[in-house]
Amino acid sequence: MPLIPQAPEGLSRRARYFVEGHGLRVPRRDLTPCREVWLKHGIPPAEIDRAVAFQERWGGLALPPAPAYEGGPRVLEADAPEGSAVDGWRFPAGGCRVSMAHGFMIGPGGEFGIDADHWTPLHASTEGWVEALALADHAGYWAGTITKIRGGAVEKLDLDGFEPVPEVQGLADTWWRGKDSLIAVYRGEALGFDAPRCLRAHIYVGLDAWALAE
């Protein structure tokens, strides 16, 4: 398997460059032998199919660390789904880089999120998570200044005149584009642990029209 990955279809040009220019593809686990075992444990076939599809599309992809969540998954990797028909089914999205109080999961609708005190979707899809990683890398490179704030200061951010960045498919985490700046707001840990002090935002200022282009 080549170490240089081919970006999955459906990503923006920026995200494709990020995946292929900064990512690695390591050998991924074959989930086929797990199917019978998982079926015996009562995992629905459709949920197994979701995990297998994720593994085929994303499994083995190692990307640079995220600016939050202590870097995100080390390698994207599916594992046994867990849950119920009542609460919905989720499966792991890959192991943490460091010891964390939460894991990374794929939700019932394909959302990428964290399994903290309660399930908290960060982005509507894994594509959204990857787009956010790519945008953080891009903004961090081109910004004149980067300001990081936490807690109550995040709630005081004035986003008037900013537009949401659609490709990140933000849920708990969102990106906002202004006339010369980008703002990333990370609410996942604050929501997942009911801890407002965990709110954080990164403000990238001094971006020209090219750096702000979609």
Q: Model-predicted segments: where are they?
A:
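Flexible glycine-rich active-site/ligand-binding loops centered on an Asp-His dyad
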Residues: 122-135
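Short, conserved beta-strand/beta-arch hydrophobic-aromatic motifs that form part
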Residues: 197-203
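A surface-exposed partner-binding patch
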Residues: 1-119, 134-189, 204-213
